[in-house]
Amino acid sequence: MSLKRINKELSDLGRDPPSSCSAGPVGDDLYHWQASIMGPPDSPYAGGVFFLSIHFPTDYPLKPPKIALTTKIYHPNINSNGNICLDILKDQWSPALTISKVLLSICSLLTDANPDDPLVPEIAHIYKQDRKKYEATAKEWTKKYAV
């Protein structure tokens, strides 16, 4: 079931790709994809390209894919290992979700961080206390690692 679903999503992505995102298999392994997200223009990540690795479990879509950023990013909901704190990748996962929808949710997270559910409390603190400093550091990291 999982391979059939993964193939359908790959076909749908090719036919109707989400804006500012792309994704596809690494080599012949349909369970391992690479994706990219363009930094949203209205965010400190504008101009950056962020790469992600996607691993589908064999029981996908019953279980969520494992997704990690492979590009370093300064964000309260994404840690230095690239782990992403996003409810739909954990307890709010639904088999109705697709990789396309997940990538768009990650894009939204880049625009609207959630400092109240941080993966990196120090960055969340700066985000809440000194937004200018947060945005300056995020822009600096984007230039350094994502351009």
Curated annotation (Swiss-Prot):
In terms of PANTHER family, this protein maps to: UBIQUITIN-CONJUGATING ENZYME E2
Enzyme class label: transferase
**Which CDD domains does the entry mention?**
UBCc_UBE2D (cd23792)
Claim: Transferase is one of the keywords in the record: yes
> What's an example GO BP annotation here?
protein polyubiquitination
Sequence similarity? Belongs to the ubiquitin-conjugating enzyme family.
Source domain of life is Eukaryota
Report which gene this protein is encoded by.
Answer: UBC4
The answer to keyword Metal-binding applying to this record is no
Enumerate the UniProt keywords alphabetically.
Answer: ATP-binding, Nucleotide-binding, Transferase, Ubl conjugation pathway
Name the chain's protein: Ubiquitin-conjugating enzyme E2 4
Q: Where is the active site?
A: C85 (glycyl thioester intermediate)
Pfam families from the entry?
UQ_con (PF00179)
InterPro entries listed in its UniProt record: UBQ-conjugat_E2_core, UBQ-conjugating_AS, UBQ-conjugating_enzyme/RWD
Q: What's its EC?
A: 2.3.2.23
Whose protein is this, by species?
Candida albicans (Yeast)
